[in-house]
Amino acid sequence: VQIAIWGQSNAVGTALRAELAAAPLSADPDLADYDANTLTFDRVRMWNGSAYVQLVMGSNNYGSAADKFGVEFGLAVRWMRETTEGTLYLIKQASGGVSITSFDPAPAALNWSNGNYEWGEAATWLAGQGVTLAARHWVWIQGESDEAQTQAWYQDRLQEILDALHSGGRMADPASRAVLSQMHPSTSTYGAGVAAAKTAIAGATPSRFSDIQFPGY
């Protein structure tokens, strides 16, 4: 299974790794062990631009700094816990402080071009290794820079991205799913229009799209 993680700073990863050993996350001691590589992500690979390599926190998870992490960590932990076989292939395209417009597919904006290119390179590498993916999924973590925008403005642009991913073959498989992450309402960069847009898209096609809110603690 392949999961592409696209978006801005929270997609890059801004959570402190030290928090994995502090309350409330310390209630799950495996988290700190996975972070320290005491427990290893034997069946999780991260794309590094030329190959898929085993995920190691602080080394190749591509957080915003070596002491930070993003959603890749939670996905990897759940994969190791909830599956007994198979490999999870992760790939990121994220930049801090960018608008959704930096992912515009037509004309192709920078993050769209880079993300689509890397996704293609990763696909070529997997094919060369004889790997056949059971499914390809997409996680969208963006909206903070567009918090002041209306639902209509944001929804049109997000739908364009989803349509382009589908028509371009990245998510054409019926098994593909897109997760649209929601900022917690208590955060300073929460945008009601952005949140409503994601909820509307997920509600229109729940078999393909879902919106999930970040936890707050």
Task: Describe the predicted segments one by one.
Residues V1-Y217:
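Cell-envelope and extracellular/periplasmic
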